[in-house]
Amino acid sequence: MGKSVAILGAQWGDEGKGKIVDLLTDRVKYVVRYQGGHNAGHTLIINGEKTVLRLIPSGILRENVTCLIGNGVVLSPAALMQEMGELESRGINVRDRLKISEACPLILPYHVAMDHAREAALGKNKIGTTGRGIGPAYEDKVSRRGLRVSDLFNREAFAEKLKTILEYYNFQLVHYYKVEPVDYQKTLDDVFAVADIITGMVADITTLLHKARANGDNILFEGAQGTMLDIDHGTYPFVTSSNTTAGGIATGSGFGPRNLDYVLGIIKAYCTRVGSGPFTTELFDEVGAEIARKGNEFGAVTGRPRRCGWFDAVAVRRAIQINSISGFCMTKLDVLDGFEELKICVAYKLQNGEIVEYSPLAAANWEGVEPIYETLPGWKENTFRVTKLEDLPQNAINYIKRIEEVLGVPVDILSTGPDRVETMILRDPFAA
């Protein structure tokens, strides 16, 4: 019987999901993206060669794996073509191994223009989006006016729909935001230039997945961003526009929740966040700067510096609840080498004095929240590229064990470097 495993971020994204997806894809036949778009960069380092994937599932680097893009993903034709070109220039066969749901909403230039215009208008109150049109594309989906991959099969109808949608967008862009309109003919020509390539990869993703399960094939679901950025369960409104949690798998691919065997939550040994929004354990001192420097904490897609802080067990407990997490993979343990002491946030003190062990949902309720820390001794020894648990410093082992105790969920995989070989699999999700 095949196993279906989900890999998703249990913090604010950038936890190192891409590496772990790539690591485990030698066990699977299918890797599935089910939400988000090209706003999340998954960085893979294999034999020293760096690859950043934004839209195509990380399994594309394994030649026997078929990659699926489910209906929950918003698809930018321009981003897809760019990424395909980069991979194909390296001899990687993409077109025969990538399948796309015809129900994927399309991201087009007017979505990007609206994203930029809104962020500029918000000024210091901006959400901190990547500016790639993700939010506006999801808005079109919910309002039922969006163009989808299926519309590419009827070009005449597509052209008419595009005309109507652009009238709506350009009116706002010109008259409210005072920016240039998006050109209809160029948008149409650019989409039609690549339409045949995209439609040639269309498949019934839901049926394909259920047949794979019936055949006993292993399936891996690749989440983007992180739990605390979920549109419903994250620090709203400082969130992304999709369901980044395990529930998004069912809605974003048509693969029912009872079919999921294991949920692997990815956590850094500390915490980071990109953009605006609450971050209780954020460090503003030299320790935070040192973590950022050692961890090379800059966004894979945007290049923006990430905010850094101590490990927040309160936020991760919320992620455990929402996702039914089976086990964790802890990444970047080596970044904590050399610190005299380390801290774990085990509870929050709210503004009214109440002590809570689970994070608030709305961003407004994080106002004035204070972290309650446990302090543990650090270690001077090197953990970088260590691949046996017994070879780790005792204080590093103690740190991991304390996090397991605080969370009540085991660390099943440990990453001590960026390359796929710099990993300890303590319990294999596909064998669990």
Swiss-Prot record:
One GO CC term, this protein: cytoplasm
Q: Where does Mg(2+) bind?
A: 14, 41
* Listed GO MF terms: adenylosuccinate synthase activity; GTP binding; magnesium ion binding
Q: Which PROSITE patterns match?
A: ADENYLOSUCCIN_SYN_1, ADENYLOSUCCIN_SYN_2
- Quick one: which residues bind GTP? 13-19, 41-43, 306, 332-334, 415-417
Write out the catalysed reaction: IMP + L-aspartate + GTP = N(6)-(1,2-dicarboxyethyl)-AMP + GDP + phosphate + 2 H(+)
Keywords assigned by UniProt?
Cytoplasm, GTP-binding, Ligase, Magnesium, Metal-binding, Nucleotide-binding, Purine biosynthesis
- What's the Enzyme Commission number for this chain? 6.3.4.4
Q: Which of this chain's residues are annotated to bind IMP?
A: 14-17, 39-42, 130, 144, 225, 240, 304
Question: Is the Chaperone keyword given for this protein?
Answer: no
Can you tell me which residues bind substrate? Answer: 300-306
User: Which superkingdom, per the lineage?
Assistant: Bacteria
| Top-rank EC class of the record's enzyme | ligase
What does the UniProt entry say about where the protein is found?
Cytoplasm
Its predominant location is cytoplasm
Subunit field text: Homodimer.
What this protein is reported to do is described as: Plays an important role in the de novo pathway of purine nucleotide biosynthesis. Catalyzes the first committed step in the biosynthesis of AMP from IMP.
**The protein's name in its UniProt record:** Adenylosuccinate synthetase
Organism the protein comes from: Glaesserella parasuis serovar 5 (strain SH0165) (Haemophilus parasuis)
